[in-house]
Amino acid sequence: MPLLRLSLVLLLLSPALCAQVAKPTLHEATLHEALLAAHADRAGDPGVATAFRHLAKTYGTPLYIYDQAHIRGQVDALHAAFAPRFSKLRILYAIKANTNPVVISLLKAKGLGAEVVSRGEIETALRVGYAGPEIMFTSSSKNPGEIQRAIELGAVLNVDSLDELGQVQAEARRQKKQARISFRINPGVDPHTIHQINTGIAESKFGLHLQDGIAFKAYEKAKGMPEIRIEGAHCHIGSQITETDGYVLTARKMLGLVKDLKEKLNIKLAFLDLGGGLGIPYEDGQTLMSPEDLAKALEPVWKEGVAAAGYEPTLWLEPGRFFVGGSGYLLTRVNTVKQTPLKTFVNVDAGFNTLMRPAMYKAYHRVRVIGKTKDPQLVDIAGDVCETGDILAEARMLPRAEAGDLVVILDAGAYGFSMASEYNARPMPAEVMVDGNKARVIRRRGTYPELFRNTERATPTKH
């Protein structure tokens, strides 16, 4: 065990220092330690391989694995950075990142509220014990049933347009209630992230624009509606944001709106939600802004804006990926290895139906071959979906893999299972949660009969 403890210390050292220190081989490891070791590029060590093989044998592949300790640690890190600097603080979890009820329950137990984007996510939040008033409902296209449900529950409706405001007013009048609302604001800020998840730019479909006073006029209109209770302002400029500049500019603009609403309309907001979007490292050696970096950058802007407004709303934050992304591992098994005149394909038993991000966003995920360290070769990790674009990782130098080997894809805890599908009539993967050296199924594997669960039984045709 002393050797194991030394190895774990080395896992936490800086990459530069680790390069100078001989790293003892991990001959045994708990499941949690094996997950950490895979992140530290130690997936070839015998103890790590034993742990992953145990998971594959017990639960099958493809398999989503989540590290409970990582999720808790991320919440603690964000709270430790912001709580000392912002006395009025509320943190929510963006449920769309990972909708598994056990994951959500873990975050609820850490004191987080729920940010949802659909009726299904509303019902998921209720299922794990959230009360309606603890929920913020954000969507750019809410249907009448969703608006009705949110008002019934007393959730905060994050209104995206004047058209929606009218619908919310009408439904609140029908229910003889006051609808709790904030407006989603488009601040016109480019956070320099992937285009498909860049939501703060002017051409985005999200929010009421600050420019030309559009957002201000929405508050002015809502103030005259007795069915509406204005509670806050919201913005979310994008996801996988790696620098503080976009947040600082957004905060400055949003606090300017807070000041204008107070001075010109006598509207005092209970909260200002700056959204989520904190990025995580998807590549080895990648250095991003930390929660501490972001909190330090926002603190002076917040204090200045609050002083100018003459009061302090509660700061709301709503990360998703930051909490769960790094906790997730997609464990797959190699079906075949195929060499062509141009490439070598390692074909695994998962595809973009299992992990959509590489195909949809050209997203990069680190890949490890379990239990292998020798004979590296340049390969593409190809999925089992019948599409040319089903490549999970392209042009990676990895130890030589063979049929039956295990390959793990890292940082798959956010927008992994939650974006998965049954395309190509392949059942959904299982999900397990690791706590120390224990694992438990938190979603069982889909079955072939379930592929037909909502269809009418067809009568066989005779020829």
Predicted regions and their residues:
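Active-site-proximal loop/turn and secondary-structure-junction residues that shape catalytic pockets
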Residues: 97-99, 120-121, 141-143, 161-163, ...
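A charged N-terminal "starter" segment
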Residues: 20-173, 177-180, 216, 225, ...
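Active-site loop/helix belt of alpha/beta enzymes
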Residues: 188-336, 424-426, 435
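Sec-dependent signal peptide recognition
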Residues: 1-9
